[in-house]
């Protein structure tokens, strides 16, 4: 990882810590490398399985939910998704057994899928940072699957050599091996410290959100974000701009693929 650091004023960060959703302590945001853990079943119904502790990312911000398994008493329950409601419900594959309430289980996130999504999510932050820095365009939409994604921008005209310039700039930022840091701040302090914190054309932060989680590609891009990320731009691997499409007057869609080993 690059030793490049950016001089910053002292910022009132909150230490990264596990987040609570309903009865479940979410483990994946404070430790994005965590792939397996012990937990206890609090509920198992047609709505899904509720654990006291979980590292399954439930989806959000364009990033799909994790897949994985629960292991208990020599039995395996495959998890095909996660649903956020008053609790965090793990959605088992149809026909798989449900562990009884009180059962001790070992949870395991599917590593290949999660790692691919982390690389893709960080790649989209890098892409939006480059397009904002070099062309002043904000994000108007986006979506991702493992190692491929789309991102829409409010870009009235396509600049000369736009595709090549974006691809070259992204490659340079990956080669620079910029650190990708995550921290949380009180909302007022976050916007005072980072006036350009929202890189979307519409502010999607809930108005009652008091603490903002921030993902910082050091020296390039700082955004409010609730997803999972790799630790440096080099870990993205490569970012190929596959296609540029017009999505109506003033809007462009970039389709990208994440390449390489990361």
Give names to the regions the model predicted:
Residues 1-262:
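Active-/binding-site microenvironments in catalytic and ligand-binding cores
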């Amino acid at each position: 990882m690059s030793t490049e650091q950016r001089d910053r004023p002292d910022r009132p960060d909150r230490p990264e810590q596990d987040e609570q959703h309903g009865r479940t302590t979410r483990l994946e945001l404070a430790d994005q490398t965590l792939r397996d853990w012990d937990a206890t079943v609090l509920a198992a119904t047609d709505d899904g399985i509720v654990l006291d502790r979980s590292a399954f990312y439930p989806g959000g911000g364009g990033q799909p939910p994790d897949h994985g398994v629960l292991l208990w008493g020599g039995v395996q329950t495959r998890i095909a998704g996660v649903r956020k409601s008053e609790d965090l419900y793990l959605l088992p594959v149809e026909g798989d057994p449900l562990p009884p309430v009180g059962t001790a289980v070992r949870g395991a996130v599917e590593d290949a899928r999660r790692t691919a999504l982390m690389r893709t999510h960080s790649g989209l932050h890098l892409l939006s940072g480059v397009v904002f820095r070099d062309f002043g365009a904000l994000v108007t939409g986006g979506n991702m699957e493992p190692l491929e994604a789309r991102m829409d921008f409010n870009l009235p005209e396509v600049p000369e050599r736009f595709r090549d310039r974006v691809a070259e700039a992204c490659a340079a930022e990956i080669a620079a091996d910029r650190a990708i840091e995550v921290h949380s701040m009180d909302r007022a302090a976050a916007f005072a410290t980072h006036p350009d914190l929202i890189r979307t054309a519409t502010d999607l932060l809930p108005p009652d959100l008091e603490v903002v989680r921030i993902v910082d590609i050091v020296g390039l891009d700082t955004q409010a974000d609730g997803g999972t990320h790799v630790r440096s731009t080099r870990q993205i691997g490569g970012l190929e701009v596959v296609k540029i499409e017009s999505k109506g007057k003033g809007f462009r869609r970039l389709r990208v693929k994440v390449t390489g080993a990361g």
